[in-house]
From Swiss-Prot:
Domain of life: Eukaryota
Gene giving rise to this polypeptide: PRPF3
Region of interest: Mediates interaction with SART3: 416-550
Location relative to the cell: Nucleus; Nucleus speckle
Binding partners and assembly: Component of the precatalytic spliceosome (spliceosome B complex). Component of the U4/U6-U5 tri-snRNP complex, a building block of the precatalytic spliceosome (spliceosome B complex). The U4/U6-U5 tri-snRNP complex is composed of the U4, U6 and U5 snRNAs and at least PRPF3, PRPF4, PRPF6, PRPF8, PRPF31, SNRNP200, TXNL4A, SNRNP40, SNRPB, SNRPD1, SNRPD2, SNRPD3, SNRPE, SNRPF, SNRPG, DDX23, CD2BP2, PPIH, SNU13, EFTUD2, SART1 and USP39, plus LSM2, LSM3, LSM4, LSM5, LSM6, LSM7 and LSM8. Interacts directly with PRPF4.
UniProt-recorded name of the protein: U4/U6 small nuclear ribonucleoprotein Prp3
Record field: compositional bias (Basic and acidic residues): 73-107
Gene Ontology annotations of biological process type: mRNA processing; mRNA splicing, via spliceosome; RNA splicing; RNA splicing, via transesterification reactions; spliceosomal tri-snRNP complex assembly
PWI domain residues: 1-87
GO cellular-component term (any): nucleoplasm
Xref: InterPro entries: Pre-mRNA_splic_Prp3_dom, Prp3, Prp3_C, PWI_dom, PWI_dom_sf
Modified residues (Phosphothreonine): 167
Description of post-translational modifications: Ubiquitinated. Undergoes 'Lys-63'-linked polyubiquitination by PRPF19 and deubiquitination by USP4. 'Lys-63'-linked ubiquitination increases the affinity for PRPF8 and may regulate the assembly of the U4/U6-U5 tri-snRNP complex.
Species annotation: Homo sapiens
């Protein structure tokens, strides 16, 4: 018979005990499987088959004990329910079937309101002022309540025994005695004592709860008007005269007393300094305590130790407790930097040792010492020093130079040897020889292509022979249709032609897909174009300097700026009257295109707006002389760039223009352009 979920929950502890008794440990999987068997109403045989994968040899023993546990759980549950039912019936027989008791109780209910009126007439129950309302019950009051409840129960027992004297009867089970006991019968003494204890416990709890409620209401006298009256009446009805309970004084802060000047004083008038407590964090408190602890550890040695002749104050005394070291991770790349620094230092020391050794052999160390000598004072521009700094090393101190030729012994460090300094390679030249690529003829290119295809075809044939790939389909075209297919083409030429055309379309599609895969995307084409324009300038930067007489036309300014940006050129355009200098830096190909722009594409001799209005009164000769043009001043290479992105700078004076070039270390560009402009104007 299948069981409900509630019954399975009640049987689960019994099954767990059985599993632990059989297996020696608890296993939730076996418990769940056993519950499923019991819940589905299986017999012992089916349950054994169901549990055999979990238990193996101990299955039968476990199933027997399982069903015994199930029966034991059912019997205990049934006995518990029957005992509850018998207990309820006995209570009903004792308290519910007595007519006089019911009448008495109904009378009590009917007289509930008059009883309050009687209580109000008694002077002892009338409460005092609201401040004296009852609080929590004391031990004495609880004892009085217990005695009153005991007296009531004793009186009730006497009434019951007076109505019908007790007669001992044999105890029979409830199932064999369905008829109810008569009204006059009494209960057994043990059951009466149990009921009496339950009644006393309930009365005590009710009294405690009532007293607690009254104590809470006493703290708020205006909340419920007659709450005190009702509580006192109930206590009086139980035969307890409640004493007057005084409320405890609530803890209030000490009143603040201020004098005429606003200072805090006590009752005697003495000034009081109040402690001001500021909010702080636990971390700050711990930090202060930590510092105090460190100060205690760093106490000075005692005087008797200092008086010792062997005492050394320079030696620090080790603390009694080791300082706590925090756990700290190293930054990423820290040890790589240290290792690189050590390697660089070792290489530098090795190089210095080699240089010094070579200098001792060749005698260059003397010239090196000469080169390290610098002038001791700053000379003004145009001043001639008495002795050049490279001669000061060989001329001793206090030596007076005269017109007569001094002796050779008067000088220091002069020998018959000639020192040749080591030649250095230029920083921008590349010593690697340039190798020209091998250019093949058409016949050689075809031969090389045939050989490459033959090698690839041979590799495919080897794979087909080894079974690594299937053999390729015959490459059929319309021209070789009859030769390849033969009889199939004769039998159904339409079908064969469709098959051949499908193969041709497939090959065409594969070819186009391969081309599309090799084709660069828009982003890749953009990167390729930028890479092509951004030339390699590691071997040197190509620089060109142009001079334009008039650069006031905004269209020409835009052309210069736009083309410089498109060709990734850097530089500057300095605008000055009759001397407009354009400096551009970049690769050789970009310089070639920009040179063509400046010297050929832009028409500089076109009439500008600035010269049009002012030259009306001038003669034709002056107009011819002031014809606008662009001149290439200088072009060459440098190691690095001097300017950034192309910008225009308006310089009203020559000094301002030269200072701008000097700031970038290229003032010679301005000097060269200005000198050519002056020479041209003089001509």
């Amino acid at each position: 018979m299948a069981l409900s979920k509630r019954e399975l929950d009640e049987l689960k502890p019994w099954i767990e005990k059985t599993v632990k008794r059989v297996l020696g440990f608890s296993e939730p999987t076996v418990v769940t499987a056993a519950l499923n068997c019991v819940g589905k109403g299986m017999d012992k045989k089916k349950a054994a088959d169901h549990l055999k994968p979990f238990l193996d040899d101990s299955t039968l023993r476990f199933v027997d004990k399982l069903f015994e546990a199930v029966e034991e759980g059912r019997s205990s549950r049934h006995s518990k329910s029957s005992s509850d039912r018998s207990r309820k019936r006995e209570l009903k027989e004792v308290f519910g079937d007595d007519s006089e008791i019911s009448k008495e109780s109904s009378g009590v209910k009917k007289r509930r309101i008059p009883r309050f009126e009687e209580v109000e007439e008694e002077p002892e129950v009338i409460p005092g002022p609201p401040s004296e309302s009852p609080g929590m019950l004391t031990k004495l009051q609880i004892k009085q309540m217990m005695e009153a409840a005991t007296r009531q129960i004793e009186e009730r027992k006497k009434q019951l025994s007076f109505i019908s004297p007790p007669t001992p009867q044999p105890k029979t089970p409830s199932s064999s005695q369905p008829e109810r006991l008569p009204i006059g019968n009494t209960i057994q003494p043990s059951q009466a004592a149990t009921f009496m204890n339950d009644a006393i416990e309930k009365a005590r709890k009710a009294a405690e709860l009532q007293a607690r409620i009254q104590a809470q209401l006493a703290l708020k006298p205006g909340l419920i008007g007659n709450a005190n009256m009702v509580g006192l009446a109930n206590l009086h009805a139980m035969g307890i005269a409640p004493p007057k309970v005084e409320l405890k004084d609530q803890t209030k802060p000490t009143p603040l007393i201020l004098d005429e000047q606003g200072r805090t004083v006590d009752a005697t008038g003495k000034e009081i300094e109040l402690t001001h407590r500021m909010p702080t964090l636990k971390a700050n408190i711990r930090a202060v305590k930590r510092e105090q602890f460190k100060q205690q550890l760093k106490e000075k040695p005692s005087e008797d130790m200092e008086s010792n002749t062997f005492f050394d104050p320079r030696v620090s005394i080790a603390p009694s407790q080791r300082q706590r070291r925090t756990f700290k991770f190293h930054d990423k790349g820290k040890f790589e930097k240290i290792a690189q620094r050590l390697r660089t230092k070792a290489q530098l020391e090795k190089l210095q040792a080699e240089i010094s050794q070579a200098a001792r052999k060749t005698g260059i160390h003397t010239s090196t010492r000469l080169a390290l000598i610098a002038p001791k004072k700053e000379l003004k521009e145009g001043d001639i020093p008495e002795i050049e700094w490279w001669d000061s090393y060989i001329i001793p101190n206090g030596f007076d130079l005269t017109e007569e030729n001094p002796k050779r012994e008067d000088y220091f460090g002069i020998t018959n040897l000639v020192e040749h300094p080591a030649q250095l390679n230029p920083p921008v030249d590349n010593d690697t020889p340039v190798t020209l690529g091998v250019y093949l003829t058409k016949k050689e290119q075809k031969k090389l292509r045939r050989q490459t295809r033959r090698e690839a075809q041979k590799e495919l044939q080897e794979k087909v022979r080894l079974g690594l790939m299937p053999p390729p389909e015959p490459k059929v075209r319309i021209s070789n249709l009859m030769r390849v297919l033969g009889t199939e083409a004769v039998q159904d030429p339409t079908k064969v032609e469709a098959h051949v055309r499908a193969q041709m379309a497939k090959r065409q599609k594969a070819h186009e897909e391969a081309n599309a895969a090799r084709k660069l995307t828009a982003e890749q084409r953009k990167v390729k174009k930028i890479k092509k324009l951004k030339e390699d300038i590691s071997q040197g930067v190509h620089i060109s300097v142009y001079r334009v007489r008039n650069l006031s036309n905004p269209a020409k300014k835009f052309k210069i700026e736009a083309n410089a940006g498109q060709l990734y050129l850097t530089g500057v355009v300095v605008l000055h009257k009759d001397v407009n200098v354009v400096v551009v830096e970049g690769g050789p190909k970009a310089q070639k295109k920009f040179k063509r722009l400046m010297l050929h594409r832009i028409k500089w001799d076109e009439q500008t707006s600035n010269t049009k209005g002012d030259d009306d009164e001038e003669s034709d000769e002056e107009a011819v002389k002031k014809t606008n043009k662009c001149v290439l001043v200088w072009e060459g290479t440098a190691k690095d760039r001097s300017f950034g992105e192309m910008k225009f700078k308006q310089c009203p004076t020559e000094n301002m223009a030269r200072e701008h070039f000097k700031k970038h270390g290229a003032e010679h560009y301005w000097d060269l352009a200005l000198s050519e402009s002056v020479l041209e104007s003089t001509d």
